[in-house]
């Protein structure tokens, strides 16, 4: 009996040691203090923050208002809209108080003698991170995820470490509402010294068929000496959680090169929007026979092809993108990430028949990408609205030359294992596209994509068609993406070598839910005394169009590979056509769905064409029109049916 007790004690101790060896990842959500304003001494451990506001992260400090016309007034000429003279833009960034400096403070405990990393999914913006009074890292771009090893700054016993984050948003730094603060999650990651770093795995599928898939896993190992023997045991789990294959490999880290394992998955379940099957690779890392890390990588098995003149193929089947562009805010909820709200948005889009999302014009929250993996949406992930030439006085151009490569690498490493991502975009309507050296900048960014992820093509949203056809810019991009300019698709196809055209941004029809204007006719930049737009879906801006043109292009040509409509949802800021001295307008009217997540009439137009599994019959406008007695009120039907009869 005594021997059994000793054995049991040894087993318990062994289990405890193994548990301690596992990584831990914690969301730092609660027990934060926040204050608007600049307090340089707030980085120090002994700073008194008791009078600060208690907040929960994610947190958008600006969404609480108040709305005010004077918040971030911008006197600019929007060259993308062909404006030549500057004018006062009211509500361009939503009329919310995002400008200024704010501080966040909290504390955390970790075990002693561990490696500790802080991962920020996004911090708006110019984030300076302090641990125990010392600056641990700086990251200027508020949309990107970044991480920093804070081990050197920790208290020796790992207890009561002070974390302070300073954020600053400058005026005229955005064309829409960016949000403010720690609006995405903050992760505390604790590992052994030898471990897999953040985004430390890369999974590719060199061969995919119905019979089998070849899966390649490359794993980075940090802090392993050249003499350390590394053993990695990896199991591949199927979508239903069963182990379908496993490998054990030994070796030594060779000059920082990743550890490679290759697998065969028989009869794979292929990822697609209709069947978003997800696998998982679970890797255990041993250093000199001691378990030091366990790391899980979710991935999908699917094959993408872009074939000249033929179009886009997913798993061998031809299809066209039925996509929308979305900004990152959640309307009245602000920019703070909210998984339930994102899921609700995607559910509405799924029912409409949408199968793709463009993250305009910035890196998305990881939660959105994970939901697209799970719910079956293809993604075009896009990082930048400007490069080295400014759109906004205090925009990203200030950091581009120094930070662009680092921002690109973080984005690519963060999302290259997600099967939903089927292409990268390197920018949106950047003024650099017309620069004499614009193609060199584009090539610089595209080459980074090819280097870090050779499995996906690159596009760019181009609106200056004459420039990019003449200067080599469009010819160099893997997949030419045209924003609007539907009348020039054929010309671009004829002149460019790729023999494919993507509608990277289309339509921009404007409408207000439940508002109908008479007489009913096509209009550009129409404005009314009530600051609304007609929901007859016949109004657009001077530079945009109604949906019909884009549908016709999709029907007529195999070489058009689909579209991303501007936008799926209304968003805060950019209230075209009421963007010039037109307060109180402070949100867009482009959305197929409004700020409250209520579908507009246009939703049913897209649903009738895109959702081929559902019946759609939607009639507009409504029935009662006091004051229009004796006048003709046009009735419009959106339906998938070849014919139907309306009886009044």
Predicted feature locations:
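Accessory beta-strand-rich segments of carbohydrate-active enzymes
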Residues: 26-28, 35-38, 94-199, 224, ...
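Extended substrate-binding grooves/exosites of carbohydrate-active enzymes
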Residues: 36, 64-66, 134, 185, ...
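Bacterial Sec-dependent N-terminal signal peptides
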Residues: 1-23
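Short glycine/proline/serine/threonine-rich loop/turn segments at secondary-structure transition edges
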Residues: 155-159, 267-278
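Extended carbohydrate-recognition surfaces in non-catalytic/accessory domains of CAZymes
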Residues: 22-116, 173, 179-182, 194, ...
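Intrinsically disordered, low-complexity Pro/Gly/Ser/Thr-rich segments with frequent PxxP/GP/PP motifs
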Residues: 249-267
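Beta-strand-rich binding/interaction modules
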Residues: 214-250, 634-645
């Amino acid at each position: 009996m005594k021997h059994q007790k000793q054995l049991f004690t040894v087993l318990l101790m062994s289990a405890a040691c193994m548990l301690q060896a596992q990584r831990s990842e914690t969301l730092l959500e609660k027990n934060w203090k926040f204050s608007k304003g600049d307090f340089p001494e707030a980085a120090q451990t002994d700073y008194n923050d008791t009078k600060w506001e208690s907040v929960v992260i994610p947190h958008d400090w600006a969404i609480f208002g108040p709305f005010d016309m004077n918040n971030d007034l911008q006197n600019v000429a929007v060259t993308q809209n062909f404006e030549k003279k500057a004018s006062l833009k009211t509500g361009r960034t939503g009329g919310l108080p995002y400008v200024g400096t704010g501080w966040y403070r909290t504390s955390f405990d970790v075990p002693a003698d561990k490696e500790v990393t802080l991962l920020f999914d996004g911090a708006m913006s110019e984030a300076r991170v302090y641990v125990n009074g010392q600056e641990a890292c700086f990251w200027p771009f508020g949309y990107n995820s970044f991480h920093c090893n804070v081990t050197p700054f920790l208290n020796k016993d790992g207890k009561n470490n002070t974390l302070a984050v300073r954020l600053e948003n400058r005026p005229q730094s955005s064309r829409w509402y960016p949000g403010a603060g720690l609006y995405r999650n903050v992760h505390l990651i604790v590992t052994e010294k030898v471990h897999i770093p953040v985004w430390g795995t890369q999974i590719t599928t060199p061969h995919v068929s119905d019979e089998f898939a070849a899966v390649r896993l490359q794993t980075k190992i940090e802090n392993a000496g050249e003499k350390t023997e590394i053993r990695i045991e990896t199991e591949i789990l199927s979508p239903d959680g069963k182990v379908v294959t496993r490998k054990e490999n030994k070796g030594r880290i060779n000059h920082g090169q990743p550890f490679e394992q290759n697998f065969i998955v028989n009869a794979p379940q292929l990822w697609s929007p209709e069947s978003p099957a997800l696998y998982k690779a679970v890797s255990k890392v041993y250093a000199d026979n001691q378990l030091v890390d366990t790391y899980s990588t979710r991935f999908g098995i699917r094959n993408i092809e872009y074939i000249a003149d033929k179009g886009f193929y997913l798993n061998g089947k031809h299809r066209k993108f039925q996509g929308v562009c979305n900004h990152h805010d959640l309307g009245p909820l602000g920019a703070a990430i909210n998984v339930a709200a994102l899921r609700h948005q995607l559910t509405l889009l799924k029912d409409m028949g949408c199968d793709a999302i463009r993250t305009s014009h910035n890196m998305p929250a990881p939660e959105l990408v994970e939901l697209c993996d799970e719910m079956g949406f293809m993604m075009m992930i896009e990082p930048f609205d400007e490069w080295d030439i400014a759109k906004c006085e205090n925009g990203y151009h200030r950091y581009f030359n120094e930070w662009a490569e680092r921002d690109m690498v973080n984005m690519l490493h963060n999302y290259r294992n997600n099967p939903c991502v089927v292409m990268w975009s390197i920018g949106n309507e950047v003024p650099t596209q017309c620069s004499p050296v614009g193609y060199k900048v584009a090539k610089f960014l595209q080459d980074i994509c090819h280097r870090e992820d050779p499995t996906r093509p690159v596009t760019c949203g181009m609106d200056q068609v004459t420039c990019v056809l003449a200067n080599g810019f469009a010819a160099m991009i893997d997949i030419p993406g045209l924003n609007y300019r539907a009348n020039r698709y054929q010309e671009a196809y004829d002149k460019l070598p790729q023999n494919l055209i993507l509608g990277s941004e289309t339509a921009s029809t404007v409408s207000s839910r439940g508002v109908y204007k008479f007489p009913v006719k096509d209009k550009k930049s129409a404005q009314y005394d009530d600051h609304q737009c007609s929901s007859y879906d016949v109004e657009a801006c001077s530079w945009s169009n109604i949906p019909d043109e884009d549908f016709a292009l999709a029907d007529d040509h195999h070489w058009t590979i689909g579209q991303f409509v501007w936008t799926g949802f209304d968003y805060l800021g950019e209230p075209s056509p009421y963007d010039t001295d037109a307060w109180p307008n402070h949100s867009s009217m482009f959305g197929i769905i409004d700020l409250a997540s209520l579908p507009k009439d246009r939703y049913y137009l897209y649903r009738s064409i895109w959702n081929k599994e559902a019946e759609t019959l939607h009639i507009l406008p409504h029935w009662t029109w006091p004051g229009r007695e004796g006048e003709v009120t046009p009735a419009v039907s959106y339906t998938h049916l070849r014919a139907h009869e309306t009886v009044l």
